[in-house]
From Swiss-Prot:
Gene3D superfamilies: Toll/interleukin-1 receptor homology (TIR) domain (3.40.50.10140). It holds the Pfam family TIR_3. It comes from Mus musculus (Mouse). Disruption phenotype: Mice lacking Pik3ap1 display altered B-cell maturation and impaired immune function. Pik3ap1 depletion has an opposite effect in NK cells by promoting their maturation. Mice lacking Pik3ap1 and Cd19 have severe defects in generation of immature and mature B-cells. Moreover, mice lacking Pik3ap1 display increased IL-10, Il-12 and TNF pro-inflammatory cytokine secretion upon activation of the Toll-like receptors TLR4, TLR7 and TLR9. This is Phosphoinositide 3-kinase adapter protein 1. Signaling adapter that contributes to B-cell development by linking B-cell receptor (BCR) signaling to the phosphoinositide 3-kinase (PI3K)-Akt signaling pathway. Has a complementary role to the BCR coreceptor CD19, coupling BCR and PI3K activation by providing a docking site for the PI3K subunit PIK3R1. Alternatively, links Toll-like receptor (TLR) signaling to PI3K activation, a process preventing excessive inflammatory cytokine production. Also involved in the activation of PI3K in natural killer cells. May be involved in the survival of mature B-cells via activation of REL. The gene is Pik3ap1. The keyword Magnesium does not apply. Residues 182-318 form the DBB domain. Changing Y420F: Fails to bind PIK3R1 in a BCR-signaling dependent manner. Loss of regulatory function in Toll-like receptor signaling probably due to loss of interaction with PIK3R1. Impairs mature B-cell generation.
């Protein structure tokens, strides 16, 4: 056993075992960095195994005003030592001054009530709590140990508790709950001002009352106060320099309450008046004739204005992932509001903030500090917008989670490359924007790009023309273009581009045909010539015909699977051997064939798939499905105006990413080919019409053509065939219309189509909490003591084997 800094009358005593050494050091640093607790004297008591607990050790506990017990596996193992537990029971009395911190120990692991009868009266904390929770629990324990609510309470304590609560020369204690009001709370420099302080507890006239003014850069000054009545104290404010000053009220040696007052000069007051008169929010409300002043109305107006002025093709091509991670101090600016994101965070413009986060440079602006060293998230919390602070933090964390998830899915075990980084950035930007704003035009284009590339060319040209010359909103695009894209997808037409089909019919080029210029005249004789015959393939070599191929079709596919390069559906093994590997350019946007969203789907894609299933089942026709999608899109745009709706979408996206990470071990490695209903070969069965289990139409059991098998040729069939073979995932839920943005139930079932096998349960992922909003945010949390399995009540220390700690967590 060892007690560091031993002395009588300590305020905080940290009781721990060697396996919680890092948590003890962390709490000491936390108490020193907090202005409200740093004045309290802190000691530590380290309990080592096989050590005795002497009377001197007992006095260390008795003189402490707060006993903070770090309950770890090693400490619980010491409870079985002979003669130690009774001494600890006496040391942890009275219970209101004891706080326990569970370090890898669960309340249900042991019957702690049998160890300590007052266990239920202890304050409890966990390793996942925020630093404010630790500070509040310690302050509460010290406050309750100070005596009682009123400083005039002089009733004698119970004689049984006297030996355990002996205190002399109590240091100041902060009790902010006793304060009601301070008038005035702003004091003019150089002017005599009387400050009135109203408290909740009764003050004793026989005890001297004083007020202590503590400036930040000068010594403290104590001024004698006057009791106006039992609850009111008046003091003459001393002449101090401008700035915030801490004010404490003492009744004898006991701190009754503490607050902060500010001193100001005449010039500072003039500046405050001018800044309040030129309030930008009130000015804009007046300019837009918003009477009475309403921040929510102004927020919607500015958000809609920004949406209408963004180019129709969107700004996501520029990216938003410019988060500065190195040399953060160089990003501090001299302005109070260096970016529009800081402005929106200060005045609580929530919808505008959500829209700005999807614009280029959003994360770069997030990493810029103003002249006071505050970032947009801390500015929002400072001005009372805690929900906005939480939204900004979760958005940035979700971007990082999503980018990491997509990059891992794209790499699929390959070495890291700049190409995957660029593809992950672009996919993350698009998916974040489409998830927070379901039904937007960017989502419509991206949804169609993967399924009907030929139909998206017209819309893409219109988007480029609108952004280059005459900027127009997405609603101004030609209605037939949008409708044709949606209709083609819902009908399940072939997704092969037209140029690919033309190459199949014209494999020999155009030089064999007469090229006619439409602008020039041509002779009638040339027009009346018979058409040129279709070129035939090369004649086979003379000799006997090749023997019939009796190898099953599916066997060929699996035989060629081992020869193909993993992850490339459209390049054969021959071309890989003959041609060198070509890596795409870093800034080249990924093609849709690579599934840039890594199996995840936007809300619009899921709604279109649901409607496509309904069309295939005959529930609705194509025209009705188009109308349903337009109605859903309009509804989503209206709901996107709500900040709460965007919060829910962000939460669903985070949960979806977490589920996919947990389900990844279940599916294992993704297979390269999607296996549909195999074709049976039989010499006795005639050719007949069959129906697959999940197919909506008949198919013929015929032998396939003898062509070179490629993975892409088998997998990338028409949307009607591929969707029919996989419609079992969504046919059940297709009867219901998806009415919200990121539906959690739908996302649960969106397992990649190629993943059909069932694997083991998901692996537990330990989430790291984020320390935010405290003056000690720079402190790194120590490693959590891992949880131990439930065991019987320990009798000897040999029965305890604490596991090693996990790596440190933190931002």
């Amino acid at each position: 056993m060892a007690a560091s800094g031993w002395g009588r009358g300590c305020d905080i005593l940290i009781f721990y075992s060697p396996d919680a050494e890092e948590w003890c050091q962390y709490l000491q640093d936390l108490f020193v960095s907090c202005r409200q607790v740093r004045s309290q004297k802190t000691q530590t008591y380290r309990l080592v195994p096989d050590a005795s607990f002497s009377a001197q050790d007992l006095w260390v506990f008795r003189d402490a005003r707060c006993v903070l017990v770090l309950l770890s596996a090693g400490l619980v193992g010491c409870f079985g030592q002979p003669g130690l537990l009774p001494m600890l029971q006496r040391a942890c009395h009275p219970p209101q001054r004891v706080v326990r911190l569970l370090c890898g120990v669960q309340p249900g692991d042991e019957d702690f009530q049998a160890f300590f009868p007052d266990w239920a009266h202890w304050q409890e904390m966990t390793c996942d709590d925020e630093p404010e929770t630790y500070l509040a629990a310690v302050r509460k324990a010290i406050s309750e140990d100070s005596g009682c609510d009123s400083v005039t309470d002089t009733e004698p304590e119970d004689e049984r508790e006297l030996p355990f609560s002996k205190q002399t020369n109590l240091p100041p204690e902060i009790s902010p709950g006793n304060l009601m009001v301070v008038q005035p709370d702003r004091i003019r420099c150089g002017a005599e001002t009387t400050v009135y302080i109203i408290v909740r507890c009764k003050l004793d006239e026989k005890v001297s009352t004083e007020a202590e003014f503590s400036p930040e850069d000068s010594p403290s000054i104590r001024v004698e106060g006057t009791l106006e009545n039992e609850y009111t104290v008046s003091v003459k404010a001393p002449d101090l320099s401008s700035g915030n000053v801490s004010l404490k009220v003492y009744s004898g040696d006991l701190v009754v309450c503490e607050t902060t007052v500010s001193y100001y000069t005449d010039m500072e007051e003039i500046g405050n008046l001018l800044s309040s008169a030129a309030n930008p929010v009130e000015f804009m409300c007046q300019a837009f004739k918003i009477v009475p002043y309403n921040t929510e109305t102004l927020d919607k107006l500015l958000t809609e204005s920004l949406k209408n002025n963004i180019p129709a093709s969107g700004l996501h091509l520029f990216g938003i992932n410019q988060l500065e991670e190195d040399d953060m101090m160089t990003n501090q600016r001299d302005e109070e509001l260096p970016t529009l994101l800081h402005f929106a965070a200060k005045y609580g413009l929530k919808n505008l903030t959500a829209l700005l986060l999807t614009c280029p440079g959003a994360l770069q602006a997030y990493s810029v500090a103003n002249k006071h060293g505050h970032y947009p998230n801390t500015i929002a919390e400072k001005h009372g917008f805690r929900d906005l602070r939480q939204f900004i933090d979760e958005y940035v964390e979700t971007v990082d989670m999503l980018k990491t998830h997509i990059k891992e899915e794209l790499m699929q075990g390959e070495e890291a490359d700049d190409v995957y980084e660029s593809m992950a950035h672009l996919s993350t930007d698009l998916l974040m924007k489409c998830s927070l704003n379901p039904g937007c035009d960017d989502e419509l284009y991206e949804s169609m790009a993967a399924f009907a590339p030929a139909a998206t060319e017209d819309l893409y040209v219109e988007m480029l023309q609108a952004s280059a010359g005459n900027p127009v909103s997405g609603e101004s695009f030609s209605r037939p273009t949008k409708d044709s894209m949606i209709r083609k997808f819902l009908e399940g037409n072939s997704v092969k581009p037209a140029s690919w089909e033309r190459e199949q019919h014209h494999p020999y080029g155009e030089e064999l045909y007469h090229i006619v210029d439409e602008d020039e005249t041509f002779s009638v004789d040339l027009a009346n010539r018979p058409p040129v015959p279709v070129p035939r393939p090369e004649a086979s070599a003379p000799g006997p015909p090749p023997p019939p191929d009796n190898e099953p079709y599916i066997s060929k596919v699996f035989a060629e699977k081992s020869q193909e390069r993993l992850g490339n559906f459209y390049v054969s093994s021959e071309s890989i051997r003959k041609e060198p590997l070509v890596r795409p350019w870093r800034d080249r946007p990924p093609s849709s064939i690579y599934d840039p969203f890594a199996g995840m789907k936007t809300p619009g894609q899921r709604q279109l798939i649901t409607l496509q299933e309904q069309v295939k089942l005959g529930i609705v026709n194509v025209d009705e499905a188009v109308l349903h999608f337009k109605e859903w899109q309009l509804n989503q745009k209206k709901r996107s105006e709500s900040f709460r709706f965007q919060q829910e979408n962000l939460k669903r996206l985070r949960e979806s990413i977490t589920r996919r990470r947990k389900e990844k071990p279940k599916s294992g490695k993704h297979t390269d080919l999607e296996i549909t209903v195999p074709i049976r070969h039989s010499q006795h069965l005639p050719e007949k019409v069959e129906f697959g289990v999940y197919e909506s139409g008949p198919r013929k059991s015929v032998l396939p053509a003898r062509t070179e098998l490629r993975r892409g040729d088998w997998k990338t069939d028409s949307m009607s065939s591929t969707a029919s073979s996989t419609s079992n995932r969504s046919s059940t839920r297709s009867l219901l219309s998806v009415s919200s943005g990121m539906e959690g139930d739908n996302e649960d079932n969106e397992i990649p189509e190629i993943t059909r096998s069932r694997g083991p349960g998901p692996t537990q992922v330990d989430g790291a909490p984020v320390v935010t909003g405290t003056p000690v945010g720079t402190l790194e949390r120590p490693p959590r003591v891992p949880p131990r399995a439930a065991s019987q009540r320990p009798l000897t220390r040999e029965s305890f084997h604490p596991p090693p700690p996990v790596p440190p967590r933190g931002r």
